[in-house]
Curated annotation (Swiss-Prot):
Binds 1 [4Fe-4S] cluster. The cluster is coordinated with 3 cysteines and an exchangeable S-adenosyl-L-methionine. Binds 1 [2Fe-2S] cluster. The cluster is coordinated with 3 cysteines and 1 arginine. Homodimer. Transmembrane segments: none annotated. Pathway: Cofactor biosynthesis; biotin biosynthesis; biotin from 7,8-diaminononanoate: step 2/2. [2Fe-2S] cluster binds at C97, C128, C188, R260. This is Biotin synthase. [4Fe-4S] cluster binds at C53, C57, C60. GO terms for molecular function: 2 iron, 2 sulfur cluster binding; 4 iron, 4 sulfur cluster binding; biotin synthase activity; iron ion binding. The gene is bioB. GO terms for biological process: biotin biosynthetic process. NCBIfam families: bioB (TIGR00433). PROSITE patterns: RADICAL_SAM. Keywords: 2Fe-2S, 4Fe-4S, Biotin biosynthesis, Iron, Iron-sulfur, Metal-binding, S-adenosyl-L-methionine, Transferase. It catalyses: (4R,5S)-dethiobiotin + (sulfur carrier)-SH + 2 reduced [2Fe-2S]-[ferredoxin] + 2 S-adenosyl-L-methionine = (sulfur carrier)-H + biotin + 2 5'-deoxyadenosine + 2 L-methionine + 2 oxidized [2Fe-2S]-[ferredoxin].
Amino acid sequence: MARHPRWTLSQVTELFGKPLLELLFEAQQIHRQHFDPQQVQVSTLLSIKTGACPEDCKYCPQSSRYKTGLEAERLMEVEQVLDSARKAKNAGSTRFCMGAAWRNPHERDMPYLEKIVQGVKAMGLETCMTLGMLNESQAQRLANAGLDYYNHNLDTSPEFYGNIITTRTYQERLDTLEKVREAGIKVCSGGIVGLGETVTDRAGLLLQLANLPTPPESVPINMLVKVKGTPLADNDDVDAFDFIRTIAVARIMMPTSYVRLSAGREQMNEQTQAMCFMAGANSIFYGCKLLTTPNPAEDKDLQLFRKLGLNPQQTRVLAGDNEQQQRLEQTLMTPDTDDYYNAAAL
C-alpha cells in the first residue's frame, strides 16, 4: 500500500505565498515546540579529497569539467584529518563533516574512511561524511565504523534538476539516501537556493525532503556561491527575503529536523542571518572554509552569537573517550600495525 505523503505541492506553495512576517511567526512557534531557540548546533566541514570530480554539477568548482583555478589534491593522510578534527573540537564544533570530491567511493577507499570515522568518533565528536553515491555494503561498513550522519543533497526539485546535473539522476540520489537510512545512519540532505530555479522548484525540493519515509535529521540550505569558471557564475543574486522564506518553510515542513545555514553565509549580513535564526535555522558550519568556498571566521560567528544571545549546542561525551582516542590514534598512525592506513599509497 502506497504511503500517503505528508505534504502536497499546493500546501507548500501556499506556505511560500504567506506574508513574510506571518510565516516567520508560524515557523518560530514550531521551532520552539521542538528546540531550545537559543541553541545552535555547530559543525565543521573538511575536504579530505579536493577537485578532479567527474560529475558536471554546474555550481561546483570541484568539477573537472570547468576551469576554476582549483588545484586537485589527493586524499589527506589519516593523521591530517584527525588533527583537523581536534582543532575543530577545540574551536567549539560538535560535529565533524568530511567531504570527498568523487562520484562514489571505491572499495579500496573503505578502510581509510572507516579509520577516520573511528578516529573522529573517539574524540567525542559526531561524524558526518559526503562521498557521493553509496552501495548497500559501503553504507553498512560506514555504519559499522560508527558514522552518525551521511550527507547527500537533492540540490533542487526533480523538474529543475536536469538543468543543473546530467551525470547523476535524481533517483540515484534518492536511492543513496534510502541505503544510508537502511544502514542505520542519520540522513543529512538539503539543497541550493540561487541555481536559477523558481519558487515552485524550491517548494518541490522541500516537498521531496519532507515526504521521504523519514525526513532528514539535518537539512542544509545553501545559498549559491558563484564561482568564476562554473556555468552559474553569472546567476542573479538571491534576494535575502526569498532565502529567509525558504528557511521558514523548511522549518514548518520538517519541525524536528535541524535546519542548517550552509554555504553562502559569507555573502549574508548579520541581519539576514539573524532573521534566518528567527525563521527556524538552528545549525551552522563553523570555520573559514566550506570545502573550497569561503565561510565567516569563527570569531565573527561568536560575535554574532553574543549579539543574538545564542549558544553553541553541546554534545555529551562519554567517559573514557580521551583514552580511547589516544589508543586508536596510536594504532592508526603506527605503520607496523594491522590497522595502519596510508592514504598516499592509493
